[in-house]
């Protein structure tokens, strides 16, 4: 009996080796997946194998579905629900305890395109911010560096937040648009997240629901609510994009979608691009103090429709005036001849004054990448009827060297000549663009920061309602605050 046991025990390694060899040399899903991984890693430079991006790449491939050969992000929310259910079941078992987590904190946020002061906070200190990869957050006292940001929900089906607004008729109602359209192009660093539509809260952000009618809107570039004779009307910029060679087309089309029933139904309001059967793709929506709606455009997937400003008092189909003079001006340029993105900023204290930033770019013949700069800054003194050029910040078009990505403007609440713009850094003009002050320096991040440090790439500039001094800035490094925006050097 003892000899049989010894013999059986000695055969165990042989059996295990055979199983390993069978698994190794049997063609199948595992082998195909190994070949897929080898192919992917072979294209990655490995000079620094312990660098953060290599760790992130490893984490990425650990979550790839071998059959799909991509990360099935559409399953994330279901996986979260399953994990939560298992944890709840575990809590009922004898001796089990819930997992406890301790927040470690961070002194830098990620790319933040959506920034909003909370209209319901009597103290005027609460703010909201949306990250393009990190979801929606709020801070009960954004004026204090010690006040922590709180996540709304880490497990929304989509954490790519691009824009946010509230209803001026009912400030308890908030809207959040998902999907980051401005990087959803063939560019040197594709980093776009496809959206799932528009989220809505009717209790000042305590709870949220996804509006079912918007689930085919792939990218929401901007969202505003207008008070139309005491009724709330939503305007959403809906566009399409491309990510890693795959086009994500919003349905039924790009355009400015209008809803007068809280988002239950929508109508596309913009005209078609000149010479096309597709509506303009909105990059920015601006509502002036008298209610006039302005829309700045961006290129669509067909590379059409950029560098255009539209305005309307009614906001409905057939009511729009189109200003596209700068298409021909840009196309006549020797280098930066592709009409780009348009950003708008109206003066709260003077409905006649509106500013427009217009980008212009080119497409690389060698890579196919889209590039764009800050082509022009315009001002209108008659509510968009006519426009004239102002000076650009020092350095010309390079002040906004990534205007497809980082491009923003804001006008002081009480001075129509005081204008902030943002590209790579923050700039300010106190005389309607005649001259400019360079206020921030992103490179100070390498030297410990300081009072002039704001992270690179400006995406949001928001004054607190009625205050010319308090202002929030959204950038690739999170949210920055100043309490003296009206000074020469905040």
List PLM regions with ranges.
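Extracellular glycan-interacting surfaces
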Residues: 2-490
